[in-house]
């Protein structure tokens, strides 16, 4: 979408060669970045909406602007501004339906399709005056229902056997063992399955012209994404029960007051609360607390006279017990002072992020088997688990980001503008609990304090050649600082030796797996 832009996994944009987490996202000038691990608010789920596109007035990717208002962005900023109502009532309705019967009866492999393949998108916008020239509103809603097959080792032809490195006979034998000795459901575990995803984006904005000098804006942006069977694990073939569900709810509410103090001074105050919630859970065939997974390696099949192998997994998804809740409070105030020759900007930006994070990767545990025979004999060669040491291993982090800045802009020659600015950003991160045992054994402190204070001078020359508004030359230099990826903070708080302990044992010390018990009693899962 823009030069020097790279689309990385999870739809996180990398700008100008910087880390994807260095890209800032703003909506109406306020934070719209995912507080857990960067990207847009919905980047972790890959949801289709961060905001209804019908609510966006304009957006831009900023990589060559030295304005001090752009903070916490080492690579650049993706910025969007929302629509508002006018004195005229306007609205729209839209619908798009890619019906199942319009889709090919065959999948990409040429096999006849058995599952629904359709997308329905619809919504509306409506805006206008509540009181003309005084009070206006604008609302928008987008909905998407996406249905597409979930393909799990769907072997229907000789070409599929080569593609998946497994035959149906091998799969049937594997599933029979999994059902008889590991309690796997009698429902199909491989093939194609219906997968439906529901997503919504709702937007509302009110603008109140209190008087000739004061404009109050209140807007709310809400997104919802329910991605059933959306979590796929990292084994080559994951049977149906290993797929997890992902639910994401995000909401931001903003209040902005723009005040014209006098002919030369304008003040703009913005206050926002951003809420993000991600809830990952096992699929419907597993208990809500999740169970270990069993990874069987070297599952062999004879295909075209040659032995081919693959890895197959049953049990729970490795992080289908994670939950991330974030509340971000932000206040920004900008003062604009304009004289006949110079435009001044002064402001501050305070942001407090309060997070509760239940990190869950490998908390359910995993068994490794090096053959189907050992899988059948209940003899794994390895067991690994991050065992919780406390009843609730949720970690709480409170992060403060504060910025103060000022700049001037003036015309120094025909078509030549000079911008000089200075920004100072301070960040304070939470400190993990001190672990005496780690210090005694390894000499490492787990309670190291982390904070940053970065001064960022910036200068830019912008030349509109001959002021013909056709040719522009820009030259700028400055320092840009991005905030730390909060996921690193979560890891630091969680892996301090007080919340979990790692179990990693090899044969002959591996406990005998009893998945039937695990499915009925969380306490039966092997711990320390």
Question: What are the language-model segments listed below?
Answer:
Residues 4-7, 288, 300-307, 432-456, ...:
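Solvent-exposed loop/turn elements at secondary-structure boundaries
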Residues 90, 115-226, 245-273, 457:
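Transmembrane beta-barrel wall of Gram-negative outer-membrane proteins
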Residues 93-99, 139-143, 218-222, 269-275, ...:
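Transmembrane beta-barrel strands of outer-membrane/channel proteins
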Residues 160-189, 294-316, 372-392, 503-528:
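Flexible glycine-rich, low-complexity coil/linker segments exposed to the extracellular/periplasmic environment
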